[in-house]
């Protein structure tokens, strides 16, 4: 499995990402993660919709909390042909608890804790921490990767304006 040392940092300290860096224009790798009820969910389930994949280290951290709430706010404005998936290594039970406490109902959270299927397929699994790096991917309705944003410093938020601009070009 490919490793990319220094691809991201946490508080300035370099970290290693496991998995190949995905590229715009290639088929989005399928993956399986667990929903809040422990049911397996594949990316291919959403074929026919544009998917925003938001990868976060943990919903129980301030930046991930803020980011996921922002995406939830926008999700209600996007219509039925766009699906936002927030993926972390948090257990499904923790994701369900967090969504309930935060009032997040317009996007779907998925847990990659079991197999790191998403993390390795998209090259965002942090080797040293077994957490996901902060990143945003947009997959078009045909399953093609149309946008990638790896946030270099894990403690920073993504560039939301760039995500929404890219989404306009895809949907």
Predicted features and spans:
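Chalcogenol-based redox active-site neighborhoods
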Residues: 1-171
